[in-house]
């Protein structure tokens, strides 16, 4: 039995003892809190929730309940300002916990609260034809961690990498490839070769503005399903994902689906038509928007003045596709807080369309922005740190330390990989999720103090103690 459940049962029994015949009709477990300071106890019950049913002030209720509790093997209860604070019997709690761990070490801490439920997690969302940089680290690792946690709690998880693969820039890239590229160079150089083509396009366009029209024409071909344009476009995606897979493999991250904006291009008509049918679209400077003034938000743009969709339209299409396909109970978007307004608008539009489930099931998991050594990330300005380079350097540093301190260690390369990559992941996840992160090499690769390597070292020492102790029975 979970400790919180047991404490709730103790509260229930105390109420029945102190106030015979009174049925408060309260879910005690749902009301139990964890105090902000451990000095106030391990759990706290707010007695004011009982005041109406018992016709008594919270302080008096807390005193009477504390007097009715006699479970020293589990906890002690103290009345404090209308709260009933519980202090666990640490010795028995530790013994009980260790017994549970030893009985099922791989499953300890798991649960079945998500049994029969599905959660879709949208995270990482790399851009096609661009290298994977540290700006993608937080969304990738937070999303992956949430995916594993939900799975451990019994949920069926669906992980989605919502690729940035739509826009006129892809027409420009195809135009550049047709003029100056060749397949061998792109296959060999990967994303770097595609980036070089894109840069050259803009350099040439400054001298020949007509190239911009050619780029737009190629993107129109993608939109219209032109076979040649689609073949090159899809090949660019394959090359990008091949490059990205090497980084994901290093991080231990996998996805169930790679479906980007292009996947939903032909699914936006349903959204637009339904908005029209329900009278939610209004015209604004030639564009079609959903008015959100009642929610103190600017209008949500659905169609531009030329009739084309934008990412909000495609996000709406993605929501309905995922609902119809996966029948989710929750859909999480692990995206930086800069997109907070966008998601509030999109989620509210779904509600206004008559789908009340959007309020509780659509969740934006926001996180802080990443800067690099005091400056904002900028690919154009060259101020960016690519993730594969970061991981390689972390592993190199770990290996150098191993060579210095434990030159005879077996599997040095594998240990260095685990320690180096672990240092990078931990340095990202240890931060408060919503706060901005300023990445510095020295901090990320510091192997002392509150770091990934220190946690791994502690685990290793614990394993060593267990081996020396020999067989231990529960």
Short names for language-model regions:
Residues 1-2:
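N-terminal presequence-like segments and adjacent domain-start helices
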Residues 6, 16-19, 25-49, 53-474:
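NTP-dependent nucleotidyl-transfer catalytic core
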Residues 8-12:
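Non-catalytic accessory regions of SAM-dependent methyltransferases
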């Amino acid at each position: 039995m979970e400790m919180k459940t047991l404490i709730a049962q103790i509260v229930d029994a105390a109420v029945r003892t102190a106030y015979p015949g009174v049925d408060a009709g309260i879910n005690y477990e749902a009301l139990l809190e964890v105090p902000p300071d451990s000095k106030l106890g391990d759990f706290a019950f707010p007695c004011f929730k009982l005041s109406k049913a018992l016709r008594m002030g919270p302080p008096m209720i807390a005193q009477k309940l504390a007097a009715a509790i006699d479970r020293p093997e589990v906890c002690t209860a103290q009345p404090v300002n209308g709260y009933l604070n519980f202090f666990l019997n640490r010795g028995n709690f530790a013994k009980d916990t260790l017994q549970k761990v030893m009985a099922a070490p791989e499953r300890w801490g798991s649960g079945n609260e998500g049994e029969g439920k599905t959660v879709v997690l949208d995270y990482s969302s790399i851009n096609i034809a661009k290298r994977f940089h540290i700006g993608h680290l937080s969304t990738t690792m937070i999303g992956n961690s949430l995916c594993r946690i939900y799975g451990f709690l019994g949920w069926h998880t669906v992980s989605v990498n919502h690729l940035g693969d739509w826009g006129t820039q892809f027409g420009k890239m195809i135009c550049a490839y047709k003029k100056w590229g060749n397949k061998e160079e792109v296959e060999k150089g990967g994303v770097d070769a595609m980036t070089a083509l894109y840069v050259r396009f803009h350099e040439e366009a400054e001298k020949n503005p007509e190239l911009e029209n050619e780029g737009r024409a190629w993107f129109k071909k993608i939109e219209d399903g032109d076979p040649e344009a689609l073949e090159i476009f899809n090949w660019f995606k394959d090359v990008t994902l091949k490059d990205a897979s090497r980084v994901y493999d290093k991080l231990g991250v996998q996805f169930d689906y790679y479906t980007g904006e292009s996947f939903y291009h032909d699914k936006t008509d349903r959204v637009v038509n339904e908005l029209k049918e329900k009278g939610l679209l209004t015209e604004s400077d030639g564009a079609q928007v959903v008015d959100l003034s009642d929610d103190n938000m600017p209008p949500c743009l659905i169609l531009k003045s030329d009739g084309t969709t934008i990412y909000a339209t495609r996000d709406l299409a993605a929501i309905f596709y995922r609902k119809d396909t996966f029948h989710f109970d929750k859909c999480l978007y692990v995206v930086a807080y800069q997109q907070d307004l966008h998601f509030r608008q999109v989620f509210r539009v779904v509600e206004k369309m008559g789908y009340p489930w959007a309020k509780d099931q659509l969740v934006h998991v926001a996180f802080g922005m990443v800067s690099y050594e005091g400056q904002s990330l900028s690919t154009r300005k060259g101020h960016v740190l690519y993730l594969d380079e970061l991981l390689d350097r972390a592993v190199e540093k770990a290996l150098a330390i191993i060579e210095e301190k434990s030159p005879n260690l077996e599997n040095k390369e594998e240990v260095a990989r685990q320690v180096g990559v672990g240092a990078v992941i931990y340095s990202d996840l240890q931060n408060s999720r919503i706060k901005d992160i300023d990445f510095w090499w020295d901090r990320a690769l510091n192997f002392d103090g509150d770091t990934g390597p220190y946690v791994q070292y502690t685990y290793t020492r614990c394993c060593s103690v267990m081996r020396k102790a020999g067989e231990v029975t529960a």
